[in-house]
Amino acid sequence: MTQPRNLEELGHRIAIQDLLTSYCTAIDNKDFDKLDDVFTPDAHIDYTSAGGVKGAFPEVKDWLKKALGLFPMTQHLVTNFEIQIDGDQATSRCGFYNPMAIPESSEEGAALRLLYFGGYYNDKLTLTSDGWRIEQRIEDTAWKDAQFPENSD
């Protein structure tokens, strides 16, 4: 990994790390409109390695609302940032660890089953007038320990 050349580049790296963390916070708080501050309006997102969808940001955002609505608890953590900046474009690869809880049944007060996912977010970013935004995300799920309850879709 090349070292940052100046304070401006350090600022960009910190801004990108903050953006990636903002994604996690928005997802875990189920504040999906905050994702508008993370992705470009025309971003392409691919979650298929984890069994999710692939498509344009607006459609994926709607899918996230529905899919993550099944989970009363999620915790998305990102680490090991590899960021390359070239002017107003950048690429990033970071590791993620994601424990999630899903009810064992549809009964009120059902016990929660924990599921665990780990892998990498591979992103292309662009610097806009509002700051850095992800224009492409490909999730690469490296492993999972996840047995969904029989009643879940």
What are the residue ranges of the model-derived segments?
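Transmembrane beta-barrel outer-membrane domains
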Residues: 74, 114-116
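Short beta-strand edge/turn micro-motifs at domain boundaries
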Residues: 91-93, 116-149
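Charge-dense, low-complexity intrinsically disordered segments
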Residues: 6, 10, 51-54, 112
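Short, surface-exposed loop/helix-turn segments at secondary-structure junctions
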Residues: 104-111, 152
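Short, low-complexity N-terminal intrinsically disordered segments enriched in polar/charged residues
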Residues: 1-29, 33, 37-41
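Short structured motifs
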Residues: 20, 76-80, 120-121
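A solvent-exposed, acidic/Ser-Thr-rich amphipathic alpha-helical stretch
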Residues: 32-102
